From Swiss-Prot:
The keyword Translocase does not apply. Homopentamer. Forms a complex with GCH1 where a GCH1 homodecamer is sandwiched by two GFRP homopentamers. Interacts with GCH1. It is found in: Nucleus; Nucleus membrane; Cytoplasm, Cytosol. It comes from Mus musculus (Mouse). One of its GO terms (cellular component) is nuclear membrane. This is GTP cyclohydrolase 1 feedback regulatory protein. Mediates tetrahydrobiopterin inhibition of GTP cyclohydrolase 1. This inhibition is reversed by L-phenylalanine. One of its GO terms (molecular function) is GTP cyclohydrolase I regulator activity. The gene is Gchfr. Gene3D superfamilies: GTP cyclohydrolase I feedback regulatory protein GFRP.
Length: 84
């Protein structure tokens, strides 16, 4: 899976950061220290970490990922990363 989306809401300085969905690479999620959860009302699982996005981006860079784009939608910030 060469593409990855991460996101955070409201305050990017403190986290949590959403780092994957139920189809994400388990080995990568373990490297990030992510936990899998299902939020009440959602019919899907997501992986999250308590780290702020900057820490997550640093960890992903060590795994060969590079940021392609970043945007803000309402109070949510989203980064799209790619691994060659």
């Amino acid at each position: 899976m060469p593409y990855l989306l991460i996101s955070t809401q409201i305050r990017m300085e403190v986290g949590p950061t959403m780092v994957g969905d139920e189809h994400s690479d388990p080995e990568l999620m373990q490297h990030l220290g992510a936990s899998k959860r299902s939020v009440l009302g959602n019919n899907f699982y997501e992986y999250y970490v308590n780290d702020p996005p900057r820490i997550v981006l640093d960890k992903l860079e060590c795994k060969g990922f590079r940021v392609l784009s970043m945007t803000g939608v309402g109070q949510t910030l989203v980064w799209c990363l790619h691994k060659e």
